[in-house]
Structure formats: structure tokens, C-alpha cells
Amino acid sequence: VDDDELLYSGEAGVQLTWMDAKVGDWVVTPRTGKAVEIQALWYNALRIFAALLEMNKEKAAADKMNGKAEQVKTSFLNKFWNAADGYLYDVVDGDHKDASLRPNQLFAVSLPFTLLEGKQAHSVLKIVEQKLYTPVGLRTLPADDNRYVGVYGGDQLKRDSSYHQGTA
């Protein structure tokens, strides 16, 4: 847990999220830092833990967890909202903010405790539907991204290098 109460994970050469494709020493989708879906899961874990504490009549501990969850939400909104594009950054690592449009941000609006509301949530859903939704599933990158690979096939190198680069 970082000073801003968000979770930081990973290190150079290591993949810790579901987008874990690696070819030799090459990390195809580097996501070191604060991944959007990890923050959404963290926020929900804190809120659920607080609810369990309340059910067990541990009000002081529940208040502490809810306070931590509010800090997470505040930090998340300050660091992850990409106002220029109307959706969430995929990963934040210090001053670097990865603006790749990926489906990972759906966790922030689809779990029981959402991190976005109103216009922001609507914007995320609208853009994901327009750019990532297909009749057979969600793309992991939009077709207009220069890294987009629409077909998963070929030898091991081609498959691994295309794995999380758009194929639905």
C-alpha cells in the first residue's frame, strides 16, 4: 500500500496482473505500478470488510476501514480519471499514466462498490462499448490503436505478442 492508499505492484520484467504475456525477457503488456482493476478490487475489499465488521458490531474498526476506502476513492479519482479522453488510465506509475483504452477499467464501474458515478461512469461505459465491444467479447485494445493485433495465431512468439493486444 502506497502513501495514497492505492496498491502498487510489479517490478521490471515481472507480470502480476491477468495481462501476463511475456516472451523471453520481453514483457508484452508492462503494467508495473497501480493497475486500474487492482484498485477497484482493493476498494471493494475494503468496503466489504467494513460491512462485515459492522455486522459483527465492530463499529470503530468498520469506521476505520470505511475511512481507508474513502482515501482510496479520493486518490483513485485524482490519479486515474483521464478527462481528456473520458475514461480511466489503465496503469499509473508515478508521473506516468498509461492512457491505453482497455477493458480493465470496467471493474471500477461494475463491482458492488463503484469508484465512478454519473457522467464519468456513463462515459467509460459508452467509450468501452463503442471501441472495445464486439459480438463475441471485449477487445483488449481498440482497433485504431497502433499496437492492435486482431488475430491470435501463428507460432508461439506471434501468439504471445498478440495475446492482450486487441483480440476479442
Set out the residue ranges of the language-model regions.
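Flexible, glycine/charged-enriched surface loops at secondary-structure junctions
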Residues: A60-A61, L138
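Short, charged, amphipathic alpha-helical segments
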Residues: D63-G67
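Well-ordered alpha-helical scaffold segments within catalytic/enzyme domains
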Residues: I38-K59, F107-G118
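Extended glycan-interaction surfaces of carbohydrate-active proteins
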Residues: V1-A35, Q71-A168
